[in-house]
């Protein structure tokens, strides 16, 4: 630890603030770096970046560590945002936070850390690393089950994990805020950020329409009968209830409608009635673009648990690895609203094995 240099990604939130503080207390040579990943227009308030930068600076000053800023907006646009738009255009629902970790925080930022002569990178993620018996590094769930973020980190490999520290991975969120308050960090009561970093709290539809032309179309029920109009397939995700604008359909009970399927060829959204309608459930899925934390799948066929969305309870399943590296996943119980473009992430107990993108 003596003089080991750690570069912490400081976002201006409480988690990264406390991460930096703990590392300093543990005797590391710590530098805080704020990553700016998005260029706002003057009229936009997407990310409250100015406030975040000010908070990040204040935290570093308070802890007594150097503060730097780095702009990754070009890398973010090329490697995260353009992919995000392509996916939406294709009718899928991508997860840019996963891609941001892969391309920016643990790639572009890691390269920058090497330039600064850093030994380790640290972030405020709720995750842990553990050395396995065979010498490999495991990605392990954060202690606070409600906050565990391994779902967003499954693309990390051995080389990245060996150079990464997650200082708050073994602490409960409430304790993190307590530590921040005790140490007079300005971020102690700052609200957790929600949503995608470049959209922030703003209305998603309004944001997306700036970049992709929407093509309106019909909404059909499962029998092909027109029951309404949609504003553009990209605005809807499987299982969605809000914003469908279907109501008072003749000869139908007043039961909520849910988006069940996208017919891209005909630009039709298929909707069904009832939260538990059979068309919203599937027992299997296929995933591509697999990342395995250990560098390879545990076996050609294995049982484990999986999540098809963040914060979902682990679901028992069987995974079969195909010749082309894709996987077929069969769940013990049917799963609601499996969404193409989102990720399926695999676990054995508290160890994250990796994951892939649902097709």
Curated annotation (Swiss-Prot):
Top-level enzyme category: transferase
Region Interaction with tRNA, annotated ranges: 147-149, 309-310
Matching InterPro entries: MnmA-like, MnmA-like_C, MnmA-like_central, MnmA-like_central_sf, Rossmann-like_a/b/a_fold
A GO-annotated cellular component: cytoplasm
An annotated Gene Ontology molecular function: ATP binding
GO biological process per UniProt: tRNA wobble position uridine thiolation
One Pfam family in the UniProt entry: tRNA_Me_trans
Superkingdom field: Bacteria
Binding site for ATP: 9-16, 35, 124
Keywords of the record: ATP-binding, Cytoplasm, Disulfide bond, Nucleotide-binding, RNA-binding, Transferase, tRNA processing, tRNA-binding
Entry annotation: catalytic residues: 100 (nucleophile), 197 (cysteine persulfide intermediate)
Intrachain S-S bonds: 100-197
EC number: 2.8.1.13
Feature type site, description Interaction with tRNA: 125, 342
Coiled coil, from the record: none
Catalytic activity of the protein: S-sulfanyl-L-cysteinyl-[protein] + uridine(34) in tRNA + AH2 + ATP = 2-thiouridine(34) in tRNA + L-cysteinyl-[protein] + A + AMP + diphosphate + H(+)
SUPFAM superfamilies, A to Z: Adenine nucleotide alpha hydrolases-like
Chain positions covered by the region annotation Interaction with target base in tRNA: 95-97
NCBIfam families, alphabetized: PRK00143.1 (NF001138), trmU (TIGR00420)
Role: Catalyzes the 2-thiolation of uridine at the wobble position (U34) of tRNA, leading to the formation of s(2)U34.
Protein name, as recorded: tRNA-specific 2-thiouridylase MnmA
